[in-house]
Amino acid sequence: MAVTPRGTSPVPPDARPRLTVLSGPSGVGKSTVVAHMRKEHPEVWLSVSATTRKPRPGEKHGVHYFFVSDDEMDKLIANGELLEWAEFAGNRYGTPRQAVLERLERGEPVLLEIDLQGARQVRESMPEALLVFLAPPSWEELVRRLTGRGTEPPEVIERRLDAAKVELAAEPEFDVTLVNTSVEDVARELLALVDVV
């Protein structure tokens, strides 16, 4: 049984909202697109990842990420509490498993915003998930976005650009590709894929 806005009723498995995974290279605008979509449709639940990365200005623990120590992340991994986890630019990121499964069981739309490694792990453990690749309009635009952040030293940006080349080459592994030429348009397209009516 799943709880719906009108009460408790059975939800056939094929009618249940599926898990949607949004991935793409660093700097492509994943967070911006998701924030725009959720502003209009807060019913789409975005999983909050755990990370060993230090907070950026304005980021809040439990809202943007669960900021954890290396030891805490080791425990989450060892206890199987993460649906997926990956290391990127010297930091680890992971999706807490239980919260995702609970929301899917209740029939709520769930969105994960994760990197390529994480998307591959989700594909392995939950093959019914829809994997969406967010691509930049061009390589030059991606470089401009990454260098324009001004929040990271040049060596970190260089690592992100190297990783972006690998991630862009993996685009064929995804079910759908959206090109981020307009945040509003891509958010609308993503919303249709998440299937929120």
From Swiss-Prot:
Q: State a single Pfam family of this protein.
A: Guanylate_kin
Annotated signal sequence is none
Is this entry keyworded Thylakoid?
Answer: no
One cellular component term from this protein's GO annotations in UniProt: cytosol
What is catalyzed by this enzyme?
GMP + ATP = GDP + ADP
* Keyword set includes Nucleotide-binding: yes
**In which residues is ATP bound?**
24-31
E.C. number: 2.7.4.8
Q: What are the entry keywords?
A: ATP-binding, Cytoplasm, Kinase, Nucleotide-binding, Transferase
Query: What SMART domains does the record tag this protein with?
Result: GuKc
This one is known as: Guanylate kinase
Provide the Guanylate kinase-like domain boundaries.
Answer: 17-195
Q: What family does the Swiss-Prot or TrEMBL record give for this protein?
A: Belongs to the guanylate kinase family.
Cellular location(s): Cytoplasm
PANTHER family associated with the record: GUANYLATE KINASE, GUANYLATE KINASE-RELATED
What is the first-listed, main subcellular location in coarse terms? cytoplasm
Summarizing the function annotation, the protein's role is: Essential for recycling GMP and indirectly, cGMP.
Output one GO MF annotation: ATP binding
State the residue spans of region: Disordered.
1-28
The record's listing under InterPro entries reads: GK/Ca_channel_bsu, Guanylate_kin-like_dom, Guanylate_kinase, Guanylate_kinase_CS, P-loop_NTPase
